[in-house]
Swiss-Prot record:
Name of the protein in question: Release factor glutamine methyltransferase
UniProt function note: Methylates the class 1 translation termination release factors RF1/PrfA and RF2/PrfB on the glutamine residue of the universally conserved GGQ motif.
Gene, per the UniProt record: prmC
SUPFAM superfamilies from the UniProt entry: S-adenosyl-L-methionine-dependent methyltransferases
EC nos: 2.1.1.297
Chain positions recorded as S-adenosyl-L-methionine binding sites: 140, 181
Binding site for substrate: 181-184
Amino acid sequence: MKKLLREASEYLLSRGIRFPQREAEDILMDLLEISSRSALHQAKLSSEEQSLYWKRLRKRGDRCPTAYIHGKVHFLGVELQVTPQVLIPRQETEIFVEQIIGYLQMHKEKTTFYDVCCGSGCIGLAVRKHCPHVRVTLSDISPEALAIAESNARSNALAVDFLLGDLFDPFSFPADVLVCNPPYLSYKEFFESDPEVRCHEPWKALVGGVSGLEFYHRIATHIHKILVSGGVGWLEIGSTQGEDVKQIFHAKGIRGRVLKDYAQLDRFFFLENQANDAVSSGEVSGFSER
């Protein structure tokens, strides 16, 4: 086993993988359904398992993300199928959604929740799992992505609604709470991104026009129709887009705040649909604002 893992690690290193030993072990642990690294070193592989292991290693060597090789991720207690038709849920999103869940648990009067551009369904399904009093609707423009989200809802026994369509088009009434992770990479950022992103994750879910800001202009134009008066929304944004997004919404008379993550990078934009200029902080634990 030591020899196999050493060869696997050396192969991944030669392919530019940043943490080759850890990833060689992770891929093998997933294949053998072993949760302990110490148990891994005691395992024995059949010739068929070795062949399958090297097949997965070669995929990783081609810079296919590990999550796509495994075919699943865990997100706040929800097991999600992930394929190249959907984005891989990010850790910073998981940390943030924990706080959104806390907000909904504190504000029981907020009973309708939209997860727009839902992809795998990670946000909406996690909200439904932890906030059963909330009616959750997930939407996406991609039929393939929506099919995966629906499959994830079934496998986790979570009752939610699904709508197929572009941004806010499929919704017929406004929500109390909205979360949207629109495409926000510029062309330049996309072509400079890691091969794991550029060559494997879905272009349509990543790129928001030449500047990366196309969808925020559209959202700002129609946000009053999608949120009830007093409704709140959080939009995921690029790490340097905070000021630009704030100006887009302010130009439409919508006040909001940029929330930063633990690394002090722009991460979310909080907004509230109300007639006056006062906006509640939108701050959640671990995310500062400006």
